[in-house]
Amino acid sequence: MWWGGRGQSFNIAPQKEEPEMGSVQENRMPEPRSRQPSSCLASRCLPGEQILAWAPGVRKGLEPELSGTLICTNFRVTFQPCGWQWNQDTPLNSEYDFALVNIGRLEAVSGLSRVQLLRPGSLHKFIPEEILIHGRDFRLLRVGFEAGGLEPQAFQVTMAIVQARAQSNQAQQYSGITLSKAGQGSGSRKPPIPLMETAEDWETERKKQAARGWRVSTVNERFDVATSLPRYFWVPNRILDSEVRRAFGHFHQGRGPRLSWHHPGGSDLLRCGGFYTASDPNKEDIRAVELMLQAGHSDVVLVDTMDELPSLADVQLAHLRLRALCLPDSSVAEDKWLSALEGTRWLDYVRACLRKASDISVLVTSRVRSVILQERGDRDLNGLLSSLVQLLSAPEARTLFGFQSLVQREWVAAGHPFLTRLGGTGASEEAPVFLLFLDCVWQLLQQFPADFEFSEFFLLALHDSVRVPDTLTFLRNTPWERGKQSGQLNSYTQVYTPGYSQPPAGNSFNLQLSVWDWDLRYSNAQILQFQNPGYDPEHCPDSWLPRPQPSFMVPGPPSSVWLFSRGALTPLNQLCPWRDSPSLLAVSSRWLPRPAISSESLADQEWGLPSHWGACPLPPGLLLPGYLGPQIRLWRRCYLRGRPEVQMGLSAPTISGLQDELSHLQELLRKWTPRISPEDHSKKRDPHTILNPTEIAGILKGRAEGDLG
């Protein structure tokens, strides 16, 4: 490492091997006492967190500049403004904190035009005067150094960030870091949301949904059926576990059909992987498969989940384009920005997901039937559509508790590969499907603000939590991996270890925590902002509660099977794809669906249902969102958070936000007082009195005339 004047170069040594946590600091020569981290800085670290380097006297941003200290630890990069009061209750959610895994790009800047990427092993031609930290959550941290970057500590903190970021893809390095309040109290901590890790959790949820024709299966308790499935799931009462084991072997990755949600009117929403067509099932296996798919209903609708929805590669490409467009340093001209936004295809994919979820919601709520979501892997789009269908159909899922339970059941417990899809194992299979789902939920929140108990701030907190590696919720791909890491399973075999519910000893306490432990990362005042002040429980009808089969549920002919694809229902001669299989379900040629156009939803064309089902009214409690043109909007508070000038003027979603915005406007009005006419000055108004709309309009008009003059 050497230093010189402007124009000289420095080299960032490549990482030769993955060191243990904190070894970056331990392997260096001890710094002089004056350069050791102060006790004040060290006291602000989380248990297990170590300061690698820091640089005081840096400045953040351009206008207005904010001076402070840039700190790099083995967990995050944080900027601490001068005089900033650190809050022990909120150690991880500062707007100045960037988890290492959240850093998407690190750039060095010198002058006005010299910009280079910083990565291990790269040779740079100049000393950085500034560094740009691009967050994968659409945030940007711009930090300038004193003396044009010639201070040794500026170079040290830059080196530390580059090296620490290179090591951040190793999830095990966070195993010794715990949240500051995680160890408070004695005994095990009760999860705020059922984690769906025990048979009791599944039985409680089954009773809550009144799914009387279903039971909790323990066939996968040792994860010997499928490691990506939860230990427990719901299967029909009359199916034995031995039949479940054989039937699941004929589906991709062993993910056979199981209940996702039971509608109060009687319909069942199932999900499964693709048929394993290379298998050779016998007659008993085919019978078990069809009984599980039929779920005791005379009408069965098989939904091709991947039809008309983007592929994983499409989702990843659209997200990369969106992130590049929304960053402050985007080179797209303002007059072409909307066209560039349309070119990302992100909003098109949001529109496609909402449209298909609306169609499936109509299928589930309009008749008593079995609706099966089928995706080859059953771990991505099935979870997205199943969750959206429940949000559209069940008011309970729109509550704060219900939504968190929904995500835990349909995403976390169901085996969505969070670590892979969020880029934790490399970019080859990265695809932020869960973030696409959160955008869809935000669209629903904008269109139906009185129907959701949670606010936009809650969605933002959940969106940002996927980039904070403080719990195992988003650090593992399957329930088996989470159980193995937390000591519930043997590390090398899929053998069940009794007593897994007991919290592990030592520093691994946080392994039992989940993303839903908001009180460990947020203050009570911040958690209050998760509530939507416009939520009206009375707005949600009570007719969705369990009751006998309603009049709008009209059963069809016996044993009818349909394929829902491209907005139309097509009859199937048999349910299983195996050649010459003695299918128990066959459709009669006289029950043919009416022609449907793929570009229109079922709700827009009387649902496109077969004529024998008759005309049915929309069931109460069902939300049918709009998805045409301007009805689908950009989530500006999330994607444009790196542009403060765009954030100004956004509507405040909470009462406290409205109060802050009102205080800001009153402060502006007090500053504009000299522009008010003499007649207004003679009134001797109290500066804290709220002006009425007429007076505000007069002030703004006077300001505008003064600016024009």
From Swiss-Prot:
Gene: MTMR11
Record GO biological process: phosphatidylinositol dephosphorylation
Expression sites (tissue/organ): Expressed in bone marrow, spleen and thymus.
Example GO molecular function: phosphatidylinositol-3-phosphate phosphatase activity
Domain of life: Eukaryota
Protein family: Belongs to the protein-tyrosine phosphatase family. Non-receptor class myotubularin subfamily.
This protein's name: Myotubularin-related protein 11
Domain Myotubularin phosphatase: from-to ranges: 196-639
Residue ranges of the region described as Disordered: 1-39
Species this chain originates from: Homo sapiens (Human)
GO cellular component: a single term: extracellular exosome
Record Pfam families: 3-PAP, Myotub-related
InterPro entries linked to this entry: MTMR12-like_C, Myotubularin, Myotubularin-like_Pase_dom, Prot-tyrosine_phosphatase-like
